């Protein structure tokens, strides 16, 4: 059924406070309740609602003291117990016969945690997605537990840090002064803008009554802050939450740090956790992540196969390091690409492999399958931008957006620049540089739009910083890849997408056999002889592509920005930084 327009009503809470409730979306769909925190209103969810409206019946409401809801005067009317009463009243009237899915932020989330402590809550709540609003019991136990163990410096210092990050609540608890200052401050457009950080203006959702709402609802702080330290339950006295819960943990939240959630699993046996690179107001900055999390949880409740993202997020579930992870590797028919695909498969990943040679990429897929892995082979010319975009579209539709993208495909070219045909020089740039650019554009955009991070690996070479006159096309393409990766890394960092540049040294692959040699005036026999000498040198080096693959896997785990591979690659990398003139002199060396 088509989504309906927003409708509103007032619901009475047990203490007589009237709660303004808004409902919209699919009237025949499952109900999802969206609960906001401070200083927001139901408007906080304006970016999320369109992503849920087709499937869900959406219920959201203004907390007491906010918007069209009543404004009780006593501070005691703003305890989390009252917030839980409000939530109970809303779902009791709007969804009396069916359990609801819940997405809640900040104090709204804390109030839902309070509700889940109550008997029978698991019959009313089908799932709970919590954003930047931990249970008071859980967080206080984390802090007290750390402070009691000064002999564990890391735990002790984290507990102190978390306590200090919440100390602003004491200031917000000062009567008269706090409401007045908030009303004045939030009347300023500049303050409202700075409060949410660098979120694009069109994604900022504040009500017109934000300043007034904040002045009224700031009573939430004196009603709960000091009380939480004295009345929170401890250890085994904390009730077990028998509801599926997923935490969306914002790594840049200045108030509740990621480690503040580390003990949640003690009291929530069915727990999922998604860490994203976002600040406190992630419902505005990452609405697609909020919506995807709700959809995934609803699918799970419906008995559908959980998504890879949900499987990865499940706390306590045994899996390989890259289990439930999708990895794309280009140039996977042989050499470094093939070994990289095999290495990630050993770590539990599903692999999307591509190569311009259909026979070799299918052989790699068969090898992965024979070892118990899963691989999806594709034929791809990475130099064709349209083909790469179509490939990315198809892969994303059939398997999902890859979590890790390895742009490896490359070719060699030997010969002096003036001896190399223009089309051959351009082909090297098109594959070695263009292939990387095309892959980053196609998949990088999708990773950013998805909003949950990821990792890109661009395979360059030590040739990026070790020039050779007989490898001008190859060195140029790899140096450009190196610099392009440095630039893109800084751009993608804001979205939580990592980027590693791999710089292999002399690696024993088939690249020499497939490299074009151009030396006018030299007969083919001499060229073949020289090719054989170089090939033998690579073989005697005995440094195989499997070692590069292991380095790639390790670099992704450790989030390394640059990773030379092989001793000579490390040595030349260091020399390029300390004695660049020494390396420039090596450019005089000739391969042929």
UniProtKB/Swiss-Prot annotation:
Q: Name one Pfam family in it.
A: Abhydrolase_1
What InterPro entries has UniProt attached to this entry?
AB_hydrolase_1 (IPR000073), AB_hydrolase_fold (IPR029058), NAD(P)-bd_dom_sf (IPR036291), Sc_DH/Rdtase_CS (IPR020904), SDR_fam (IPR002347)
Provide the AB hydrolase-1 domain boundaries.
Answer: 30-286
Residues of the active site are 474
Which SUPFAM superfamilies does this entry report, sorted A to Z? alpha/beta-Hydrolases, NAD(P)-binding Rossmann-fold domains
A single GO molecular-function term is: oxidoreductase activity
Q: Which major enzyme category is it?
A: oxidoreductase
Q: What is its EC number?
A: 1.-.-.-
Which cellular component, as a GO term, is one annotated location? plasma membrane
Q: Which controlled-vocabulary keywords does the entry list?
A: Oxidoreductase
Q: Which residues bind substrate?
A: 461
Similarity section = Belongs to the short-chain dehydrogenases/reductases (SDR) family.
Q: List the protein's name.
A: Probable oxidoreductase EphD
